[in-house]
Amino acid sequence: MVAITHTPKLKHLDKLLAHCHRRRYTAKSTIIYAGDRCETLFFIIKGSVTILIEDDDGREMIIGYLNSGDFFGELGLFEKEGSEQERSAWVRAKVECEVAEISYAKFRELSQQDSEILYTLGSQMADRLRKTTRKVGDLAFLDVTGRVARTLLDLCQQPDAMTHPDGMQIKITRQEIGRIVGCSREMVGRVLKSLEEQGLVHVKGKTMVVFGTR
């Protein structure tokens, strides 16, 4: 359920960063607001971010997480210049982040000189599309227990997951899991209790050990 990128990273990162403005964001601060104008591409130098959408009642759903080496804010880059649509999602710093920002115009200029930059971005977009397609399928075909279990396995692949003698250890709140799978915090709690009774996980607060994962 969680989008995780395993796509190629830039070989000539310094060349891109030389044309970027670098900014630091504290944990939980908003980097992109839904409804903003699309005119800038972002690249994560250090840290990780959360991509999410929000309905009219303020309820949030987490689309995925991006980590060091990933681009975001790229959709407007491929729209007709001057006719870009507004940002469709929010992006928030999951932890303290260092992010490089570059205008679409400058990125287009650089990509004409070095196609590898555009290829890397395209590879990441393709990977996210695959993950999004899988998430839509999960929402349609898996019950809540299946979606929570899939999410826990995906989170074990995130950079902040820690190895544990019995598997992998992750830290996440029930509320955040609910925002990923599309259910209430209470429902997540019931599912986690069931998984623990089956001997699949151990849960203590927001720390969870997923057994048999490495």
Swiss-Prot record:
Gene Ontology biological process terms, A to Z: DNA-templated transcription; positive regulation of DNA-templated transcription
Binding site for 3',5'-cyclic AMP: 59-60, 73-75, 87-88, 132-133, 179, 185
Keyword DNA-binding set for record: yes
Gene3D superfamilies listed in its UniProt record: Jelly Rolls, Winged helix-like DNA-binding domain superfamily/Winged helix DNA-binding domain
Record-annotated HTH crp-type domain positions: 142-214
Superkingdom, taxonomy of origin: Bacteria
Keyword Ubl conjugation belongs to the record: no
Keywords, comma-separated and alphabetical: cAMP, cAMP-binding, DNA-binding, Nucleotide-binding, Transcription, Transcription regulation, Virulence
SMART domains the UniProt entry points to: cNMP, HTH_CRP
DNA-binding region: 174-193
NCBIfam families reported for this sequence: PRK11753.1
Primary role: Global cAMP-dependent transcriptional regulator that controls virulence gene expression by distinct cAMP-dependent and -independent mechanisms, which allow to fine tune its virulence program in response to specific host cues or environments. Controls the expression of many regulatory targets including type II, type III and type IV secretion systems, flagellar-mediated motility, and quorum sensing systems. Transcriptional control is exerted by binding to a well-characterized consensus site (5'-ANWWTGNGAWNYAGWTCACAT) within target promoters.
Quaternary structure (record): Homodimer.
Protein name per the record: cAMP-activated global transcriptional regulator Vfr
Organism: Pseudomonas aeruginosa (strain ATCC 15692 / DSM 22644 / CIP 104116 / JCM 14847 / LMG 12228 / 1C / PRS 101 / PAO1)
Lineage: Bacteria, Pseudomonadati, Pseudomonadota, Gammaproteobacteria, Pseudomonadales
